[in-house]
Amino acid sequence: MTIILATGGTGGHVFPAITLAKALKVQGHNCILFTDQKTINIESYILPLCKPSGNKLKFLFLLMYSCVLALYQTRKLKPKLIIGFGSYASFPTLLAAKILSIPIVLHEQNTVLGRVNRFFFKSAKLIATSFPETKYAEGSKCVFTGNFVDIEAQGYSRAETVLNVLIIAGSQGANFFDDVVSSVICDLPVEVKERIRVTQQCTKKNINKVKSLYKSEGIDCELSEFFDDMENKLANAHLVISRAGATSIAEITLAERPAVYIPYPHSKDNHQFYNAKHIEDSGAAVMVEQNSNAKKNLGELLVDLLQNCQKLRDMANNTKKTRIRNGVTEFIKAIAQELS
């Protein structure tokens, strides 16, 4: 059957949709992504949206225009199901589903049900969550499946000489990682800097600056705007420093890697804080909030962790307590049961 997946906004919404689409295609379904993302290697229909944080009038105009386009394309494709992944980019397609009386299933990646998913909550036949406890996701329609990621645990390797530190900035507030996190790494004690190798996701405009900074401190590094071999990077990491987006957390936790999470302070409903807290409460990560004390707190924490390999191993083992899981199979079972 034809299934439309409504997604967009950030990679945290898009990547799970792509993972699910690939799994559904294997089962013979025709999947099409309705999204605002233009560089994804899967069949998709692009909606001309812009981010709501910019020009408000432009956003509202493009949102209304996208609603008309989504309605037209949806009526033309006649899908049997529309799956929403949250974010403003999913709104036009989910609205079309409601108008055309097409069954809606929602997937929430974060520990707080997003605003668009809350808006369509009553219209949905099923709401699947990535965390065992999700704020605003209550009732018989809600089921914990897990997030959708292509990561498998490979065991935590003991660091004999070099400690590999993986830094994942994500798409929101990446300049903080380029500037503050890199500066903290360079201010570590000499005996720590001599042992570490940094693999870091940087914004394109800052790669040369950050590389020069590390070089001046004698720190071995690999920098890139995007890593297309994230599973391999995680497998080699002894510690990960990351934003607390749900998909990043799922990948890091399923890879059984200890982490330091720095939640993006402007995330809607402060969901990154609650994402990180869930993992911290399980002993698999430590959270550092982005505030005036962030540089000092992060520096002290990294000195402690990078000089205590046993603590890193304990955190890696605690990832098994988080209940984070790859939910593709469970989700497909749930929607099959719901639509049967």
UniProtKB/Swiss-Prot annotation:
Membrane topology per record: Peripheral membrane protein
UniProt-annotated binding residues for UDP-N-acetyl-alpha-D-glucosamine: T10, G11, G12, N110, S171, Q272
GO CC terms, sorted: plasma membrane
Annotated Pfam families: Glyco_tran_28_C (PF04101), Glyco_transf_28 (PF03033)
EC number: 2.4.1.227
GO molecular-function term, one example from the UniProt record: undecaprenyldiphospho-muramoylpentapeptide beta-N-acetylglucosaminyltransferase activity
Entry keyword set: Cell cycle, Cell division, Cell membrane, Cell shape, Cell wall biogenesis/degradation, Glycosyltransferase, Membrane, Peptidoglycan synthesis, Transferase
Family: Belongs to the glycosyltransferase 28 family. MurG subfamily.
Protein name (Swiss-Prot/TrEMBL): UDP-N-acetylglucosamine--N-acetylmuramyl-(pentapeptide) pyrophosphoryl-undecaprenol N-acetylglucosamine transferase
Organism of origin: Wolbachia pipientis subsp. Culex pipiens (strain wPip)
